[in-house]
Amino acid sequence: AKKYKVRLLSEAEGIDVTIDSADDVYILDAAEE
């Protein structure tokens, strides 16, 4: 599976997170880990 860097950015919530995610993993599932 390919690997992607996924950035979750929300200035309102003060969130700026970069996670590694595979294309066979749902983004929400990866963010919860």
UniProtKB/Swiss-Prot annotation:
Subcellular location: Plastid, Chloroplast
Domain 2Fe-2S ferredoxin-type: 3-33
An example Gene Ontology CC term for this record: chloroplast
Cofactor note: Binds 1 [2Fe-2S] cluster.
Superkingdom to which the source organism belongs: Eukaryota
Annotated GO MF terms: 2 iron, 2 sulfur cluster binding; metal ion binding
Chief site of localization: plastid
Entry keywords, A to Z: 2Fe-2S, Chloroplast, Electron transport, Iron, Iron-sulfur, Metal-binding, Plastid, Transport
Family membership noted in the UniProt record: Belongs to the 2Fe2S plant-type ferredoxin family.
General function of this protein: Ferredoxins are iron-sulfur proteins that transfer electrons in a wide variety of metabolic reactions.
Designated name of the protein: Ferredoxin
Organism: Porphyridium aerugineum
